[in-house]
A protein has these predicted regions:
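Basic, flexible Lys/Arg- and Gly-enriched helix-loop patches that mediate nucleic-acid binding at interfaces
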Residues: 2-228
Length: 228
């Protein structure tokens, strides 16, 4: 950041301590953030000449950006908090990566590549629809996909409550149960809901690529640092 260049305090907190902007606003509203020795106010803007403190500790402005790719195992959730008996992917990560935020998500029953970073601009560019980042999945259905349903999904799209869903499909086996699925959107459980709308259950959903980042041979439950 250039000297004197202003940014919103909640964005700064979200990027530096690994929380959402809403959580950052809660900290500010609760009087837990100080700027230059004074209690910060909602909507405040700061620059790198300011001293920002939380829990009596100064939060540095300059940070080294980290980018991770993880092969998320089935059964793990992408949130920071454990949900019921389901462990979180953060239980896999060592302490130095605990403040990283996920770039998009995979549901508990899905596996494959998930990205994590402390670079908010990178996360935005990877997830905002205007940047069109293709994601590739390997999907196994409970039965053979009928050619008519293949055409409906790939050529015309399926009407879902949150809009039309159109997926690229590539057959992976002669039984027509295994498919490579291409999509650039990221709606919640979109692939599962699309197939369910025409009568199929997704038995396996595994993401192998997110934008230019590929899973390659990374084992389940392992992670590696990547370059932006």
């Amino acid at each position: 950041m250039q000297t004197g260049q202003a940014l919103r305090l909640n964005k700064f907190l979200a990027e530096r301590i690994g929380i959402s902007r809403r959580q950052a606003d809660d900290l500010i509203a609760g009087g837990k953030i100080q700027v230059n020795g004074k209690t910060a106010q909602l909507g405040a803007r700061i620059d790198n000449t300011c001293k920002v403190c939380y829990n009596n500790k100064t939060i540095p402005f300059e940070t080294s950006y980290i980018y991770l790719a993880m092969n998320k195992p089935v059964g793990y959730v992408c949130s920071r908090r454990q949900q019921g008996d389901s462990p979180t992917i953060y239980s896999i990560l060592p302490k130095q990566y605990q403040t990283l935020k996920t770039v998009g998500r995979l549901d508990k029953d899905s596996s494959g590549i998930i990205l994590l970073t402390n670079d908010g601009d990178f996360a935005f560019q990877m997830t905002h629809p205007k940047f069109v980042k293709e994601k590739i999945y390997e999907v196994t259905l409970d039965r053979a996909l009928e050619p008519l349903h293949q055409q409906m999904i790939a050529d015309f799209g399926i009407d879902l409550p949150d809009g039309k869903s159109k997926l690229g499909l590539e057959k992976l086996d002669e039984a027509r149960k295994s498919w490579r699925v291409y999509m650039s959107e990221g709606r919640n459980r979109q692939i599962r809901r699309t197939f369910a709308a025409v009568g199929y259950q997704v038995e396996k959903l595994h993401r192998v690529q997110f934008g230019k980042y590929q899973l390659n041979n990374l084992p389940a439950g392992k992670f590696t640092e990547i370059e932006k």
